[in-house]
From Swiss-Prot:
HAMAP family: HisC_aminotrans_2
Record-stated family: Belongs to the class-II pyridoxal-phosphate-dependent aminotransferase family. Histidinol-phosphate aminotransferase subfamily.
Pathway: Amino-acid biosynthesis; L-histidine biosynthesis; L-histidine from 5-phospho-alpha-D-ribose 1-diphosphate: step 7/9
Gene Ontology MF: a single term: histidinol-phosphate transaminase activity
The enzyme's E.C. designation: 2.6.1.9
GO terms under biological process: L-histidine biosynthetic process
Protein's recorded name: Histidinol-phosphate aminotransferase
Subunit text: Homodimer.
Cofactor needs: pyridoxal 5'-phosphate
Catalysis performed (reactions): L-histidinol phosphate + 2-oxoglutarate = 3-(imidazol-4-yl)-2-oxopropyl phosphate + L-glutamate
Keywords: Amino-acid biosynthesis, Aminotransferase, Histidine biosynthesis, Pyridoxal phosphate, Transferase
Length: 358
């Protein structure tokens, strides 16, 4: 029996999302997944793992609501922000009929999730300055239900102009939802749209504990939206989205003292990012270093140096972004520890075109 005949056609042709961990399995310095380089120290407290956990842990929700400056009924907690991306499509998009929009270069899971669910998508590239092409979006809103905007944008690191986002919210009012993916917003909180939630009922914000909170392995994210949207999402979320250990660690991570530790981590990352950018600009193999408001830096390299391959041979793992529109010869470098940033710069400064033979 050929099992493939039983599979959905869109799955047979699906190109799965290539996570940073899938792409590379070996290395000593991991600067490819935008993780915090040092693990926080939390201990598992709950012993009664013979019971199912609650679907929406109230202490986690209440503490994150306080941190984010919203009400508890405006929050859904999920298995990372990736699950939120999927839940929104399940609730608002009819397969084969409705459409989502995303604007590359950007995070790849918007496209992959739509393809898995059989949701049509419309690609509207950003302008050369990586800002939104509002005119093109406005002219292509037919059947659109969701517009996904990553801010700060991954992998470019830039902030989408708030004025553009406000204009977009007005353009799509009574037509679609704007979903702003704020996975990296903790590194530039002034750019958050969270204060706009009371004014725009069609605004949805995605958050995570993976980046600034240094808990990528936990898989815990949040959807911030008006209560009506949250109630709809609760209809389709799994009955036990978070395991008891995840709930336990998330509760600990959102206490006042832990949030202060997170703020200290953010300050360290921002300092190291500036050190990394300054050093990269002095490397002859670098053609351009793009400004960043997140925990990573996008860099365009001279292709003659084969930087990705050369550094990988030395145990330094970066993320190749060359397959994204407008990002030929670009690599994304996660901001690591001070020593990691200095080491990467030191290695890059020593590169010569002769390194092609490596």
């Amino acid at each position: 029996m050929n099992i493939r005949y039983l599979a959905r056609n869109n799955i047979l042709t699906l190109k799965p999302y290539q996570s940073a961990r899938k792409c590379t399995h070996s290395g000593n310095i991991w600067l490819n997944a935008n993780e915090f380089p040092i693990a926080p120290d939390y201990q598992f407290r709950y012993k009664k793992i013979h019971r199912y956990p609650t679907c929406q842990p109230q202490e986690v929700i209440n503490n994150y609501a306080y941190y984010a400056g919203v009400r508890s009924d405006q929050i859904l907690v999920s298995r990372g922000a990736d699950e939120s991306i999927e839940l929104l499509m399940k609730v608002f998009c009819n397969p084969g009929k409705d459409v989502i929009i995303f604007c590359p270069p950007t995070y790849g899971m918007y496209k992959t999730t739509a393809e898995i669910l059989g949701i049509n998508y419309r690609i509207i590239p950003k302008k050369e300055n990586w800002q939104l092409d509002l005119a093109s979006i406005k002219s292509q809103l037919n059947n659109v239900k969701l517009i996904y905007i990553c801010n700060p944008n991954n992998p470019t690191g830039n902030i989408i102009h708030l004025n553009s986002l406000k204009k977009l919210l007005k353009i799509i009012q009574n037509r679609a939802l704007l979903v702003t993916d704020e996975a990296y917003i903790d590194f530039c909180p002034d750019a958050s749209l969270v204060r706009w939630l009371p004014m725009y009922p069609h605004l949805v914000i995605l958050r995570t504990l993976s980046k600034a909170f240094a808990l990528a392995g936990l898989r815990c994210g949040f959807t911030l939206a008006n209560p009506e949207i949250i109630k709809l999402l609760e209809k389709v979320i799994a009955p036990y989205p978070l395991s008891t250990p995840v709930i336990d660690i998330a509760e600990q991570a959102l206490t006042p003292i832990s949030i202060q530790y997170t703020q200290n981590r953010i300050a360290t990352v921002n300092t190291n990012r500036n050190i990394l950018i300054t050093g990269l600009k002095k490397c002859s193999c670098v053609q351009q270093v793009f400004n960043s408001h997140a925990n990573y830096v996008l860099v365009k390299f001279n292709p003659k140096y084969q930087v990705f391959k050369t550094l990988l041979h030395q145990g330094i793992v970066l993320r190749d972004q060359s397959n994204q529109p407008g990002l030929v010869n670009c690599l994304r470098i996660t901001v690591g520890t001070y020593n990691e940033c200095k080491h990467v710069v030191s290695v890059l400064k020593k590169l010569h075109v002769a390194s092609l033979s490596i």
